[in-house]
Amino acid sequence: MNWGIPFRHLLLVLQLALLPAVTQGKKVVLGKKGDTVELTCNASQKTTTQFHWKNSNQIKILGKQGSFLTKGSSKLRDRIDSRKSLWDQGCFSMIIKNLKIEDSETYICEVENKKEEVELLVFGLTANSDTHLLQGQSLTLTLESPPGSSPSVKCRSPRGKNIQGGRTLSVPQLERQDSGTWTCTVSQDQNTVEFKIDIMVLAFQKASSTVYKKEGEQVEFSFPLAFTLEKLTGSGELWWQAERASSSKSWITFDLKNKEVSVKQVTQDPKLQMGKKLPLNLTLPQALPQYAGSGNLTLALEAKTGKLHQEVNLVVMRATQFQENLTCEVWGPTSPKLMLSLKLENKAATVSKQAKAVWVLNPEEGMWQCLLSDSGQVLLESNIKVLPTWPTPVQPMALIVLGGVAGLLLFTGLGIFFCVRCRHRRRQAQRMSQIKRLLSEKKTCQCPHRFQKTCSPI
């Protein structure tokens, strides 16, 4: 029998077995500090062969002995594991939990006379301080990285703004829209890992608001917050600058504790009313021209540096009629582009100007509308009814004057009438007197003649 060939085959197999394991290409895996990573290692065949994980110093970390998982005396001993259920499929991964920056190094998997190298790079991205920041404050994100790495960071804010940087990334002047989840991508050697950081921007829902009211109407000021906290404690104050006043003054001060509001001090004119629960609400009993102006509500939160601010404006409208003049006026901060108009109902505007007062002389009878509008959108409207001319306040005085004149004329006429009548009677009396006198003279003259006629001889 020829034993040469089998012996040569056995020798070749023995030599191959003694050869060192072949090293495969190195893979790069990026991990996040505090997270879990799985380093994969696969055999060419589905088998339950032996495998070992080591670090770059050839210290055994994890392996398989029979059907059991064995762990070495490395610093990862309490944070490593493997998926035993996948061993029979030729998958021999190493799972590292609660990653640390110092876990960054090269790990070697030995299986089937081959070596697979995996370079693990662990990064951490954290906010410089609290993730609850006041509107207007700055956000700084700091990247922790292993020595020798040169990563880049790109973050996208909830409002879609992109910010790029290196190991430090700064975002000045945070806005209310920046509140939410920030998505940051760390890149290294064409590999990426994604971080999500929740940032809460403490702010009011609106930076500024304007309330439009007719004179005499009740005014409601609302200051809703753009965030929700379980425990909310602080203090606030509303300062008001009236348009007609030379300086601003404090209208109300209050405390906020566990979302409940208590008033500390309030002015007597005007006497504001405040709700006892969030959102912050203030009520002004009447909108008057002397109250029109601008206010600034500040809210200081406990354990926070700085204050929240919201500006509020009050615009008051008045429509009046005096004598033959119909006037429409507004008080308070208004944009120069706003239009103020006076129009008869269902008719075109009689007057329309970019002004704070308009008027119409001798207005027609009917319902007039005073309108404050912005690009065709009516912001404020006040109606006033113009009555017919005769009942206007000026007529009674005219009637009194006319009555006086008529009375004077009548009195004068009656006086003249009675004077003429009196003269007429006097003349008539004089004439009668003359007639009587003449008649009496005629009688005395007739007696002798009558006597002579009777005594004459026959």
From Swiss-Prot:
Record GO biological process: adaptive immune response; cell adhesion; T cell differentiation; T cell selection
CDD domains named among the record's database cross-references: CD4_CD, IgV_3_CD4
Cytoplasmic compartment residues: 419-458
GO cellular component, one term: plasma membrane
UniProt xrefs under InterPro entries: CD4, CD4-extracel, Ig-like_dom, Ig-like_dom_sf, Ig-like_fold, Ig_C2-set, Ig_sub, Ig_sub2
Domain notes from UniProt: The Ig-like V-type domain mediates the interaction with MHCII.
Domain Ig-like C2-type: 126-203, 204-317, 318-374
Disulfide-linked positions: C41-C109, C155-C184, C328-C370
Extracellular domain ranges by topology: 26-396
Modified positions (Phosphoserine) in chain numbering: S433, S440, S456
Domain Ig-like V-type: 26-125
Described purpose of this protein according to its UniProt entry: Integral membrane glycoprotein that plays an essential role in the immune response and serves multiple functions in responses against both external and internal offenses. In T-cells, functions primarily as a coreceptor for MHC class II molecule:peptide complex. The antigens presented by class II peptides are derived from extracellular proteins while class I peptides are derived from cytosolic proteins. Interacts simultaneously with the T-cell receptor (TCR) and the MHC class II presented by antigen presenting cells (APCs).
Entry PTM: Palmitoylation and association with LCK contribute to the enrichment of CD4 in lipid rafts. Phosphorylated by PKC; phosphorylation plays an important role for CD4 internalization.
Entry protein name: T-cell surface glycoprotein CD4
Main location: membrane
GO molecular function terms attached to this record: coreceptor activity; MHC class II protein complex binding
Lipid-conjugated positions (S-palmitoyl cysteine): C419, C422
Subcellular location: Cell membrane
Annotated glycosylation sites: N42, N281, N296, N325
Keyword Ribonucleoprotein set for record: no
Membrane topology note: Single-pass type I membrane protein
Bilayer-crossing regions: 397-418
Segments forming a coiled coil: none
Originating species: Chlorocebus aethiops (Green monkey)
